[in-house]
Amino acid sequence: MQLENIKKLQDLDVKGKTVLVRVDYNVPLKDGKVDNNKRIVASEKTVKYLLDNNCKVVLMSHLGRPKGKVASEFSLAPVATEVANVFGVKVHFASDCIGEPAAKTIAEAKNGEIVLLENLRFHPEEEKNDETFAAQLAKNGEVFVQEAFGTVHRAHASTSAVTKFLNGGIGYLVQKEVQFLGDALAKPNRPFAAIIGGAKVSDKIMVLNTLLSKVNVLVIGGGMAYTFLKAQGYTTGKSLLEEDKVEEANKILATAKEKGVEILLPVDHVCSTEFSNESPVMTTENANIPEGQMGLDIGPKTIALFDKKLLECKTIFWNGPVGVFEMSNFEKGSFAIASSMVEATKLGATTIIGGGDSLNVLKKAKIKTDLLSHCSTGGGASMEFVEGKELPGLTALAK
């Protein structure tokens, strides 16, 4: 995805204007308060730039999956309080994202203040990329800024159709995301390693095939590793296995060999008879998993093997945990990958986390995101970017 044809925030004439910004404030709430404000803080540079330019800043976002109906538990009202805390200016909350409630609230706000509109997904038209709805959203501003990297892979009214009615460009967060991911893939410092974890091969086939033409080392962990091990003739016990993807795994292994890509798979495992933190744990001697046991994390030999290889690399991309890190018995492997990423960064490597569960690993391991080069805010979007897919929220702005 090239940025040449897309205007950047700093190229837009915004001074003193009402600017409509699509943000990703899909944040976790607990007891009616924002539990983690990282996504709000991530938009800080763009919002502050607009406030400094005496703009009236109108923010729109989704929250959760209300399925096109108004549902109080998905209201952005508690988020407005946190937005005020983060930016230190008056925040007006509009009880709807279109029509009279939005227009009235925006009219009451002064330049240098923020308006947060109610959840976009209270309207079924949002996810249908409906043009009539997008035209109503566009009435809320004079310029449009796309600052929600986490949703640019969706063709929704607030990311795609709205650009037919308002000129605009991308904010600093989206610029940073596209630049980091784009540079890492187009001109990485080598050796370049990708760590791909997660449960299913079927979810990651496209990304694995794309990465094979870009990386020097491909590290495979998590539930999907067992399908690859089965393809290599190892026993997998009662581990998660996609029998119908064994052939696909074989093809990926053959392509890697052909392209000279080194593939690293687990050489030992932490297992249990049940998918539970309470059942007894055993560590295998090698890559075979005994009958009745299921692999739930990588073992100590694998941790050492992966760590040694990652510390030799100059660019590392990580998406997906290598074990069931939500359970304390099976968190060590994913925590070790996170630590290796931090160490590699200290040694001068560019380290990128592709959003999603890998970020939750950092949070659980109490590792600060700024110890890595870049932590993507969009799991699905970053993976589709890596796959080379078109991102509707960006192509809509390429005029």
UniProtKB/Swiss-Prot annotation:
Residues spanning the signal sequence: none
Keyword Nucleus: no
CDD domains: Phosphoglycerate_kinase (cd00318)
EC number: 2.7.2.3
Gene Ontology molecular functions: ADP binding; ATP binding; phosphoglycerate kinase activity
Localization in the cell: Cytoplasm
Residues that bind ATP: 204, 295, 326, 355-358
Main location: cytoplasm
Involved pathway(s): Carbohydrate degradation; glycolysis; pyruvate from D-glyceraldehyde 3-phosphate: step 2/5
GO cellular component, one term: cytosol
Record has Disulfide bond as a keyword: no
Residues holding substrate: 24-26, 39, 62-65, 121, 154
Gene Ontology biological-process entries: gluconeogenesis; glycolytic process
Subunit architecture: Monomer.
Similarity remark: Belongs to the phosphoglycerate kinase family.
HAMAP family: Phosphoglyc_kinase
Identification of the protein by name: Phosphoglycerate kinase
